[in-house]
Regions:
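Extracytoplasmic/periplasmic sensor domains and loops in membrane signaling proteins
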Residues: 65-79, 96-135
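Hydrophobic beta-strand positions
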Residues: 84-86, 99, 145
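Bacterial N-terminal signal peptides
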Residues: 9-15
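Bacterial N-terminal signal peptides that target proteins for export
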Residues: 1-8
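Sec/Tat signal peptide C-region and signal peptidase I cleavage site
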Residues: 17-21
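Conserved beta-strands of PAS-like sensory domains
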Residues: 57-63, 136-162
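Short N-terminal helix-loop-first-beta-strand/juxtamembrane motif that initiates sensory/input modules
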Residues: 25-27, 32-45, 71-92, 130
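Extracellular/periplasmic ligand-binding regions of membrane signal-transduction receptors
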Residues: 22-64, 99-105
Length: 162
């Protein structure tokens, strides 16, 4: 009887961890919390990402452009893709990502597609739902990143592959 109870509890614990791991809202909350622990978001100057000059986005003193530790931590903890975009004019450009192109390289320098997520974050709103990311279907969440003055300066993203 004790073995059955222990087995049942272990199964429930594993099931709960898988349910949590595939919860896009919990995963985006974790990404945003990790970024927030580094410091307040801001844009300062420019940086080259995939051969293109784009605004440099910082959290605290850490420049996020071409820095992959936070997004790779999300992959490790949640088995999810993660990206930080910076706003460049009317576009949002991937400056830190674990999303891979079909060639197997990080998709930095690519833009957020003009889709439902783009429409929501452009208005300062979260988007969670199905989305195509560089040709792959995901259950995703996107949050606008705002500076101290409330201006949208970027977007955080996570996705769980369907």
């Amino acid at each position: 009887m004790k073995l059955n109870r222990a087995l049942m509890l272990a199964t429930l614990a594993v099931s709960a961890s898988f349910a949590h791991a595939a919860d896009p809202k919990a995963t985006i909350a974790d990404l945003d919390a990790r970024l927030g622990k580094i410091g307040a978001p801001r844009v300062e100057g420019t940086d080259t990402v995939a051969g293109k000059a784009v605004p440099a986005i910082f959290f605290g003193e850490r420049k996020i452009n071409n820095n992959f530790d936070v997004v790779d931590g999300i992959r490790k903890s949640h088995q999810a893709t993660a990206t930080v975009f910076v706003k460049d004019g009317e576009e949002f450009v991937r400056v830190s990502t674990n999303v891979l192109t079909p060639e197997g390289k990080r998709g930095v320098g690519t833009q957020l597609a003009r889709n439902a997520a783009y429409e929501a974050v452009s208005k300062g709103q979260q988007y969670c739902g199905p989305i195509d990311v560089l040709g792959t279907a995901f259950d995703a969440c996107y949050n606008p990143i705002k500076d101290a003055g409330g201006k949208i300066i970027g977007v955080s993203y996570i996705g769980h592959k369907k």
